[in-house]
């Protein structure tokens, strides 16, 4: 296929439509305008963000395609932001000034408005089974923001599990790929305050224009919108505007979207349009890895057996682990003592005592019995029907995961069962969690309930 100067961009688009996803084509390529001469083609992007993205991801592909269509290896393709001029009166100096102004405006707005924590990146996010999927999806979004399959991205889980870290990591990842992008991180409470302030100062037009034109909007703790009708109404329209334009939306909450009370159904429905991913409390291996990673960042000597001890005792969330580590570090520096298990046991005695009270076997039995609508006595009975056996195995596995009780102690609390029965239950549940999505979902729900 060959082209003429007058049909070049149209012919390029026809081929590009088959080479890129429909979402990418609509978002990045269709908005471009062309100005073609015998020696080059200038593409005009409606804003700096699209210009930067096309320049980084498609310009080489477009240039090669244009050269092939014209059979001219010297043909050049350039891109700049702005509207295609009706007459070519803009000088090079004027165009350079326009580009610099646009870049400076976006950079200034980004530095002032993004609120991203540059220290929260993917490289220092400790991965484990509890957050593996969430991290993978977040990285995909950072590389390809706006892809419909993950828009919005909804991360949910208990306090201190790393949702906010991942949120910032995605934002920083988007900016790393495209420094011109307008990425805004906002806690839900701050968003509400911004909305009320705009309302009172009669600046709603400015408020709407800003939030509806960003390239990625990251809202933390969306459950804070509960019962705030005005905020929900405005966010509904912001969501629609961004989604229709293929802009990325990322939200976090302490619970699954449909479980958030006093949030309008139309918003809950939209929260589920993309992908919702749970972040669970970290398992022992991840807890230990987090402690060792944080200790390394502090240049702190933390023996692995001590990390195992702390990780085995404190199971609720990452924030709790960091708090414990900070206390141990401070006490060690103040006293000059070596960090041993005995030293940690003494330093964290109040935290460890509280943790023992937080999750008990009795509490686990009650939560599991309520969840499956059976009696606690069923969990302790000799009954072997499937509707009793599976909850019993789950309860025993949870007791091993969330308490400091030994296998024999757990067995005694479940109708004087042998420790080998408890071990078998733990192995069976671990296997089922990998093979059966229903069991994994039950496990996640129970863990979240017990971690509150």
Curated annotation (Swiss-Prot):
Q: Where is this region: Domain IV, binds dsDNA?
A: 333-452
Which subcellular locations apply to this protein? Cytoplasm
> Would the keyword Coiled coil be found if you checked this record's keyword annotation?
no
Gene Ontology BP terms: DNA replication initiation; regulation of DNA replication
| InterPro entries the record matches | AAA+_ATPase (IPR003593), Chromosome_initiator_DnaA (IPR001957), Chromosome_initiator_DnaA-like (IPR020591), Chromosome_initiator_DnaA_CS (IPR018312), DnaA_C (IPR013159), DnaA_dom (IPR013317), DnaA_N_dom (IPR024633), DnaA_N_sf (IPR038454)
Predominant localisation class: cytoplasm
Keywords, comma-separated and alphabetical: ATP-binding, Cytoplasm, DNA replication, DNA-binding, Lipid-binding, Nucleotide-binding
Return the GO cellular component terms, semicolon-separated: cytoplasm; plasma membrane
Q: Where is this region: Domain III, AAA+ region?
A: 115-332
Provide the GO MF annotations for this entry: ATP binding; ATP hydrolysis activity; DNA replication origin binding; lipid binding
Give the residues the record marks as binding ATP: 160, 162-164
Chain spans, region Domain II: 80-114
Q: What is known of its domains?
A: Domain I is involved in oligomerization and binding regulators, domain II is flexibile and of varying length in different bacteria, domain III forms the AAA+ region, while domain IV binds dsDNA.
Q: Which NCBIfam families match?
A: DnaA
Q: Function of this protein?
A: Plays an essential role in the initiation and regulation of chromosomal replication. ATP-DnaA binds to the origin of replication (oriC) to initiate formation of the DNA replication initiation complex once per cell cycle. Binds the DnaA box (a 9 base pair repeat at the origin) and separates the double-stranded (ds)DNA. Forms a right-handed helical filament on oriC DNA; dsDNA binds to the exterior of the filament while single-stranded (ss)DNA is stabiized in the filament's interior.
Question: What interactions and quaternary structure are annotated?
Answer: Oligomerizes as a right-handed, spiral filament on DNA at oriC.
* Assigned protein family: Belongs to the DnaA family.
PANTHER family cross-referenced by the UniProt entry: CHROMOSOMAL REPLICATION INITIATOR PROTEIN DNAA (PTHR30050:SF2)
Record-given protein name: Chromosomal replication initiator protein DnaA
Q: Which species expresses this protein natively?
A: Histophilus somni (strain 129Pt) (Haemophilus somnus)
């Amino acid at each position: 296929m060959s082209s003429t100067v007058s049909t070049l961009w149209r012919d390029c688009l026809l081929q590009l439509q088959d080479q890129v996803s429909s979402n990418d084509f609509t978002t990045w390529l269709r908005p471009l305008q062309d100005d073609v001469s015998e020696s080059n083609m200038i593409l005009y992007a409606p804003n700096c963000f699209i210009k930067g993205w096309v320049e980084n991801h498609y310009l080489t592909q477009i240039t090669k395609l244009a050269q092939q269509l014209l059979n001219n290896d010297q043909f050049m393709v350039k891109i700049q932001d702005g509207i295609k001029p009706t007459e070519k009166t803009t000088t090079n100096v004027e165009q350079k000034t326009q580009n610099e102004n646009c870049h400076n405006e976006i950079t200034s707005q980004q530095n002032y408005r993004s609120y991203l924590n540059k220290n929260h990146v993917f490289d220092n996010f400790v991965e484990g089974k509890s957050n593996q999927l969430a991290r993978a999806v977040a990285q995909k979004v950072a590389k390809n923001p706006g892809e419909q399959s993950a828009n919005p991205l909804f991360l949910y889980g208990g306090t201190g599990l790393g949702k906010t870290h991942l949120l910032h990591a995605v934002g920083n990842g988007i900016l790393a790929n495209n420094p011109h992008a307008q990425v805004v991180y906002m806690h839900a409470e701050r968003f509400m305050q911004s909305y009320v302030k705009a309302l009172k100062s009669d600046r709603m037009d400015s408020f709407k224009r800003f939030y509806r034109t960003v390239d990625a909007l990251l809202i933390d703790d969306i459950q804070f919108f509960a019962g705030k009708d005005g905020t929900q109404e405005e966010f509904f329209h912001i969501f629609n505007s961004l989604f229709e334009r293929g802009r990325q939306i990322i939200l976090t909450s302490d619970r699954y979207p449909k479980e958030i009370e006093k949030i309008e159904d139309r918003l809950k429905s939209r929260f589920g349009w993309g992908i919702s991913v749970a972040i669970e409390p970290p398992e022992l291996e991840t807890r230990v890895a987090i402690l060792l990673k944080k200790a390394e960042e502090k240049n702190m000597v933390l023996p692995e057996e001590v990390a195992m001890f702390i990780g085995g005792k404190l199971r609720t969330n990452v924030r709790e682990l960091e708090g414990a580590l900070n206390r141990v570090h401070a006490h060690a520096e103040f006293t000059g003592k070596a960090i041993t298990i005995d030293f940690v046991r003494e330093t964290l005695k109040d935290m460890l005592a509280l943790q023992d009270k937080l999750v008990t076997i009795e509490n686990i039995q009650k939560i599991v019995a309520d969840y499956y609508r059976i009696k606690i006595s069923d969990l302790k009975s000799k009954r072997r029907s499937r509707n009793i056996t599976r909850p019993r195995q789950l309860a025993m596995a949870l007791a091993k995961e969330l308490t400091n009780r030994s296998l024999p102690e757990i067995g005694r609390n479940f109708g004087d069962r042998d420790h080998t029965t408890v071990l078998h239950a733990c192995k069976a549940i671990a296997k089922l969690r990998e093979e059966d999505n229903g069991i994994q979902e039950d496990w996640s729900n129970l863990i979240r309930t017990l971690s509150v």
